From Swiss-Prot:
Residues 506-515 have a biased composition (Low complexity). This is Protein DETOXIFICATION 32. It comes from the Eukaryota. The lineage of its organism: Eukaryota, Viridiplantae, Streptophyta, Embryophyta, Tracheophyta. The keyword Membrane applies. It is found in: Membrane.
């Protein structure tokens, strides 16, 4: 019992030291002029890129795992390529949207806890997220098990549905790997352990490429070989990250498994569900764009051209996701440390940087609009349509570089529920109806559908900008402190009370024994 008291006192004193260190790093002073703005901008940019650079690289590497399998499947046969593509985009994509969203709740809590010095609770949050995400994965297994009839219901051919259904069954282990990874990644990002994540992702990608080639093509295992390697690669990322955490890299943020992880799961699940709704409404919105294009008069050309544009859009989105992760970490850290002025300023820095990147990419595409479509298709109709869609693609890239930054702020501040309502109104009550009217009623085809849905994105971005503009950042810092107390301090107090009661019981027992 004495050992427990000593350990607990050490934990409290070390926590106070970290809190004192955090509080000594005071909020930034008001900007006094142009030179001061440039100096503060450069300093904040350095912090953002320190997080965003490795986060972008990690996203590229993990995105490439599925891409490598898909490319090699094309060298097996056409059916294998179709099956892997459908499973990856529809079945797996649906699940990823839900679990990635649920995992973002951890970004809010861990980021704010780290900023406030409540390091011990971060490991508890991680374990709670593991429990909730794996429970969610268990439910999502139904989509994998019944993938064949679901794909047939969506209009896929019997051959593709059957092959994709078989591949989906093989990919169930990856689903649970996602559940572990999405939580672990947020835990590491909150502590700025992004370099380690990048090294792990790059190493796994190299072995994944080699083993996929060996099993799928050289040994002729086909889709089965791809499933084996893809499952193994994702679990290798998970195991390596967990070993890295348990090896002491996270310090007091990881103190081992605890029964505390099973407390207050209902409240944690509510925040996770709000996060999932926010992300899913965004992911499914663009999935609907391709679905609607398949019902146009010339669906082959429309879907082919749109797929090319979506593939191009995917790479800038990886950059935007890196900024999303960096902004959510920095925002939650600063709010947790009660630095409202710095939290507001980093949003300005992230917006300017992200928009600048989007403009450069968009201008490049517009300049090369006569040439780049030939890299993706030999069909003249498809090339012409891609060229016509390039201005919309360029504008979408700029808007999409703004939107993830705003979403990162929302995650960092814990606004997932508010953003979910905004997404429903802007995307599904505004964007999709306008797109359907322009595409079908006014016969503008895929350009009309895309224009309408882009309108929804612009409205959503405008609403988020207005919300952020009207935000009282001092109040948000206070709310972050209250949230940390709700999720952390109360648990620590309960732990202290339990220890004190146990001490008193033991002391009374010893006194009675002496008597």
């Amino acid at each position: 019992m004495e050992t427990l008291n000593v350990d607990h006192e050490d934990t409290i004193s070390s926590e106070q030291e970290h809190r004192a260190h955090t509080k000594s790093d005071t909020d930034m002073p008001p900007i006094s002029g142009g030179r001061d703005f440039i100096r503060q901008f450069a300093a904040e940019s350095k912090k953002l890129w320190w997080l965003a650079g490795p986060a972008i690289f990690t996203s590229f590497c993990q995105y490439s795992l599925g891409a490598v399998t898909q490319i090699l499947a094309g060298h097996v046969n056409t059916l294998a390529l179709a099956a892997v593509s459908i499973q990856n985009s529809v079945i797996s994509g649906f699940s990823v949207g839900i679990m990635l969203g649920m995992g973002s709740a951890l970004a809010t809590l861990c980021g704010q806890a780290y900023g406030a010095g409540q390091l011990e609770m971060m490991g508890i949050y991680l374990q709670r997220s593991w429990i909730i995400l794996n429970s969610c994965a268990l439910l999502l297994c139904l989509f994998y098990v019944f993938a064949t009839p679901l794909l047939s219901l969506l209009g896929q051919s019997p051959e593709i549905s059957k092959a994709a259904g078989k591949f989906s069954l093989w990919m169930i282990p990856q689903l649970f790997a996602y559940a572990v990874n999405f939580a672990t990644a947020k835990f590491l990002q909150a502590q700025s352990k992004v370099i380690a994540m990048a090294v792990i992702a790059a190493t796994v990608l190299l072995q994944h490429t080699l083993l996929s080639w060996l099993l799928m093509l050289k040994l002729r295992w086909g889709m089965a070989g791809g499933a084996v390697v893809l499952n193994m690669s994702w679990w290798l990322i998970d195991v390596t990250q967990i070993v890295y955490i348990c090896g002491g890299s996270s310090g007091r943020a990881w103190s081992g498994l605890s029964w505390m992880a099973f407390k207050n799961l209902r409240g944690f699940a509510r925040l996770s569900l709000a996060s999932a709704v926010m992300v899913c409404l965004e992911v499914w919105y663009f999935m609907a764009l391709i679905l609607f294009a398949g019902y146009l008069k010339n669906p082959q050309v429309s879907v082919a051209a749109l797929s090319i544009c979506m593939n191009i859009l995917g790479w800038p989105i990886m950059v935007a996701f890196g900024f999303n992760a960096a902004v959510s970490v920095r925002e939650s850290n600063e709010l947790g440390a009660e630095h409202p002025r710095r939290a507001k300023f980093l949003l300005i820095v992230a917006m300017i940087t992200s928009v600048s990147i989007g403009i450069v990419i968009s201008v490049t595409l517009i300049v090369l609009r006569d040439k780049y479509p030939a890299m993706f298709s030999d069909d003249e109709e498809v090339r012409v349509l891609v060229k016509q869609l390039t201005p919309l693609l360029a504008l979408t890239i700029v808007i999409n570089n703004i939107q993830p930054v705003l979403s990162g702020v929302a995650v960092g501040a814990g606004w997932q529920g508010i953003v979910a309502y905004v997404n429903i109104g802007c995307y599904y009550l505004c964007g999709i109806p306008i797109g359907l009217v322009l595409g079908y009623k006014m016969e503008l085809g895929v350009k009309g559908i895309w224009t309408g849905m882009l309108t929804g994105t612009v409205v959503q971005t405008s609403v988020l900008l207005f919300i952020i503009y009207r935000t009282n950042w001092k109040k948000e810092a206070s709310l972050a402190e209250a949230r940390i107390k709700k999720w952390g301090d109360q648990s620590n107090k309960r732990e202290e009370i339990d220890l004190c009661e146990e001490d008193e019981n033991n002391s009374n027992g010893e006194n009675n024994h002496r008597k």
